[in-house]
Each structure stands twice: as structure tokens, then as C-alpha cells.
């Protein structure tokens, strides 16, 4: 692998100008290293998996030699290799990921960054130092693209274009919809007795066609799907068990497409919980569109009229396990969350997660009691009336004040005019 690297060395000396040393170029050819003949204070060799740093003890070029104990490498302060005091260099040899080095991926290179630190300390009982503290940034750059073989490419009977493939991530989403399913619901508020219209989708792009399923869903008073209390809405790999009670919750048949699944849930709130809101977390997954639905991949609703389960698609017997509560090997349970995503926008109330499967949290769904709404409306009129009365009161006070001022000036004028009449 051809390696390219780069070293930026800047030493800021107290009371002096900044010294910058260019990086020497080291090339590994035939297992031998060749460096520039000019003496550099710091030499760096970026190898395939390691970093070799050689530091001259005359680091500042002043003739004052530094001590090896005052040199460390990286945020983790790795110490140099053991050397003889008579040697005029100090060496470090560490792995690229060692000593707290950081890695950055650019469009054309992998960049490993660290630094060499010279932190002089007093010797013995002395309280003085004779060299400066210096921090020298170090970078190793490795190209991300290149020909790793010097041999010519041998042709095959398959065109090269047939060996190229693309892998695209899947994007899952769970949204709260209006009753007509045509638009996303603008407000998260509900009244008890309403139904929440939920739409799960998977966006495949150029991926092969997939069929989406809601594996399980749970409602909690907080975004944490492991919170208590909780209520299970979908369980056993696609059984909408919330419809077993007095609710009419069900999957919508037929589905708009293989990549979309719609279902309704009769809204509720947890008893003795003053928050009057819930969050719904659903585990979404997808299978190839040509694969037949089975007990592990299904969407089943309960019909109270026939007292039986029925699927959105596929054979009817795949829903029989919903009554037994055992539909094969359990997937991610409520106590073992996979990935939780919450709404990031208050208006749209949805978040997308990119993976092969996803746990999506939608919420909060806020419930308004109808009696509470009536009380709010009743209180709205007195509030407006109080504003009106306040305005009338201020007007009366202003008029009374003006009348009092006029009377005071009138009396003063009459009092001032009486002595004049007496003198006449």
C-alpha cells in the first residue's frame, strides 16, 4: 500500500517568532528507509500500522539538550522508547490507534492525528527550567483509493460492470396521519374515543422490493419503551392484540403497497397518570416482497363479529398462533430494546431510522377530556368580560379624575376673584 503522510511542526518560543519545520519525506522501498540528509528536530515515519517519531535532543536548535523524560506522545502521554543517555535522539514507536490518537475520514484520505509534547520539569531540588514547553501536531495521511497491485488487470468472461453492485440503506418511518390517510396529522391532541391513524413505511430506493411488517408495539407514558406502566398494542410478530378488548384497533385492508402498512388504535391514557399522554414504540422489519407471509412475518387483526383473527395478506392460518400467544421464536422483547427513535419535529411528529430493522417511537399523543374542554370554553367568556370591565373601570376613573380637576380650578378662580369685587 502506498502511504502518504504529512507533518506540521510549529514551535512557539517565548519572546521569539514561530518556528515551523517542514516534514521530511520517508519512502519505504525494499524494506529500507531513506531520509533526507538535512538534520530535522522531529522526524516522522508513517508505517502501515505504526507511527515512528524521532526527536532530536537539541529540539530548539540552541544547544540546550532536552531530557527524554520531558517528552510524551498523544493525549495519553505515551513515554518514549528506552535509550542511552549518550544518544542524541529520542524515539517513539506506537500503533496508529494508540496514545489517544484521533482518526478523521476525508473524501480522499484517512488522517490520523496526534501530537508530541515537550513539558520541561525542574530537575532535583531546583525550581527552574531552561527550555520551553512546546506542543507539535503530527498527522499521518493514508490515501483511500489506489491500485494495490502492480500487475495488469486480467480480463475475465464476465464484463466488469456485472461485478459492480450497490448497497442502499433502508429508511423506516412511523407517522401519525389524518383520518383520510392523505396527510400527516398536524396536531398531536386527541379526545378519548378517537382513533389514532398510524402509518408505517419503508423507503427502499434502488433496493429490491420489500414487504413491511409491524412486529410489535408498546405504549408508555414516556419515550422510554421500558417505562412503566405500559400497554401492548401489537405482539407475537404482528398480532394487533389491542383489538381483543373493547377497542376497534385493526390493520387497514388492503394495504396501500408492500412497503406501507396502516393501522388504527383507539386512543387511551393510563389511569392515575396526570400527564394524559402516551408514546407508542413499534418494531418495524421487512422481508423480500416475493416471500410469502408466515407466523413470524404477518399483520393480523381480531374480528369481534367472527371472533377470529384474519391477516392483511397471506393464508388465514398464519394468524392462528395469535390466540395461543406463541408465534415462534421471540424477536426483540420490550425489555431488550433495539433502537429507539423519537420525534424531532413538533409539527410532523416523526423520526426516521436507517437500518435493516428499527424501533420507531411516535409521540407524545396528548389526550383532552371533553369535559375539560367545556370548562375551558366556559372560563373563556369571564376572561373576556373581565377585560371589558377593566376597560370600563379605567374610563370611569379617568372621567372622575377630570371632573375633580375642573372643580378644583373653578373653586380657585372664584376665591381669587372675590377680593377684587370687595375693593370696588
UniProtKB/Swiss-Prot annotation:
Entry membrane topology:
Single-pass type I membrane protein
Locate the Pyrrolidone carboxylic acid modifications and list their residues: 23
Its job: Component of the zona pellucida, an extracellular matrix surrounding oocytes which mediates sperm binding, induction of the acrosome reaction and prevents post-fertilization polyspermy. The zona pellucida is composed of 3 to 4 glycoproteins, ZP1, ZP2, ZP3, and ZP4. ZP3 is essential for sperm binding and zona matrix formation.
Q: Which PANTHER family match?
A: ZONA PELLUCIDA SPERM-BINDING PROTEIN 3
Intervals, Cytoplasmic compartment: 409-424
The transmembrane residues are 388-408
The record's tissue-specificity note reads: Expressed in oocytes.
Q: Which residues form the propeptide?
A: 351-424
On subunit structure and binding partners, the annotation says: Polymers of ZP2 and ZP3 organized into long filaments cross-linked by ZP1 homodimers. Interacts with ZP1 and ZP2.
Is Cell membrane among the key words of this record? yes
A GO MF label: acrosin binding
Disulfide bridge map: 46-140, 78-99, 217-282, 239-300
Span of domain ZP: 45-307
- Recorded superkingdom: Eukaryota
**Name listed for the protein in its UniProt record:** Zona pellucida sperm-binding protein 3
| Subcellular location, principal | membrane
Q: How is it modified after translation?
A: Proteolytically cleaved before the transmembrane segment to yield the secreted ectodomain incorporated in the zona pellucida. N-glycosylated.
Any notes on this protein's domains?
The ZP domain is involved in the polymerization of the ZP proteins to form the zona pellucida.
Give the UniProt family note. Answer: Belongs to the ZP domain family. ZPC subfamily.
One Gene Ontology biological process: positive regulation of type II interferon production
Tell me the Pfam families matching this sequence: Zona_pellucida (PF00100), ZP-N (PF23344)
Localization, per the record, is: Cell membrane
Per UniProt, which keywords does this protein have? Cell membrane, Cleavage on pair of basic residues, Disulfide bond, Extracellular matrix, Fertilization, Glycoprotein, Membrane, Pyrrolidone carboxylic acid, Receptor, Secreted, Signal, Transmembrane, Transmembrane helix
